[in-house]
Regions:
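Short, small/polar-rich loop/turn modules that mediate ligand/substrate recognition or access, typified
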Residues: 183, 188, 242-244
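Alpha-helical segment proximal to the catalytic Tyr-Lys
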Residues: 131, 180-181, 240
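Substrate-binding pocket helix/loop in short-chain dehydrogenase/reductase
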Residues: 102-103, 107-115, 212
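Residue(s) in the substrate-gating loop at a strand-loop-helix junction
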Residues: 150
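Conserved glycine-rich cofactor-binding loop
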Residues: 19-20, 43
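Short C-terminal tail/terminal secondary-structure segment
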Residues: 2-5, 155, 232, 243-257
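Active-site helix of classical SDR
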Residues: 126, 167, 175
Length: 257
């Protein structure tokens, strides 16, 4: 058993926002470790391209180009997945949005867009996929839900991303509340709080890597392997007893800023 602690062979996974950035890192890790992976993204062309790329890593990666920024979109994605798979072992709620604006001019739409995608969508997508998650779950092999939060929900980022910080702090607490309920159904809910990883959402880490790395105790930004490793841990047998917790993957930033 110890040799299979991190195996995902035979498992079915769905990663939202899986066509790029952190979602793509996680999806790549899952495929490499044997899972059948579905990735969702609103950009159909990019979603299909990423699925084809990741399929070359060894296991199938299937594109589901659906916009999950609304409750209806989340329900549509759930229907599309369940039309293809009778069960779902792993759900990664990764799709997210941010909004940067000064306090005096921060608009209501900057709250609505971010809270809808970052908090409401993870809840309602998990709710819609609950039948498939329950179908896969057993006491010996629970299904997994992994919410991607942020260190900005734990400590304060100097940038004025008010709704983003609030949404990620809220999703961390929602993770705990969902975890207590869903573990009754053999569904284990946890979260990952990434720090600086190169992506379109974190353009500072992408475009100014050395400058950002100098402010990180580990002296580097996160790599694809760092993120994939954290997600594989939580998704596999190794993470079965991690219920409601948030795994911080940030090179020490949270404790230094």
């Amino acid at each position: 058993m110890m040799t299979d602690l991190f195996s995902l062979k035979g498992r079915v996974a769905l990663v939202t926002g899986g066509s790029r950035g952190i979602g793509k890192m996680i999806a790549a890790g899952f495929v490499s470790y044997g899972a059948r992976v579905y990735i969702a993204s609103r950009n159909a062309a990019v979603c299909e391209q990423t699925a084809a790329e990741l399929s070359k890593l060894g296991g199938p990666c299937i594109a589901l180009p659906v916009n999950t920024s609304t409750v209806e979109g989340a329900q549509s994605l759930a229907s599309a997945l369940m039309a293809r798979e009778p069960r779902l072992d792993i759900l990664v709620n990764n799709a997210g949005a941010a909004w940067l604006a000064e306090f005096d001019s921060f608009p209501e739409k900057g709250w609505d867009k971010v809270m809808d995608l970052n908090v409401k969508t993870p809840f309602f997508l998990t709710q819609a996929l609950a039948p498939a998650l329950r179908a896969a779950a057993t006491p010996a092999k629970p299904s997994k839900v992994i919410n991607i939060v942020s260190i900005d929900g734990i400590s304060v980022n100097p940038q004025e991303t008010y709704s983003y910080a609030a949404s990620k702090a809220g999703l961390m607490h929602l993770t705990k509340r969902m975890a207590l309920r869903l573990v009754e159904d053999n569904i284990v809910v946890s979260a990952i709080a990434p720090g600086a990883f190169k992506s379109e959402m974190n353009i500072l880490a992408r475009d100014h890597e050395q400058e950002v790395a100098a402010r990180i105790p580990a002296r580097r930004v996160g790599t694809d392997e760092d993120m994939a490793g954290a997600a594989i841990y939580l998704a596999s047998r190794a993470g079965d007893y991690v219920v409601g917790s948030t795994l911080i993957v940030d090179g020490g930033v949270t404790y230094a800023r």
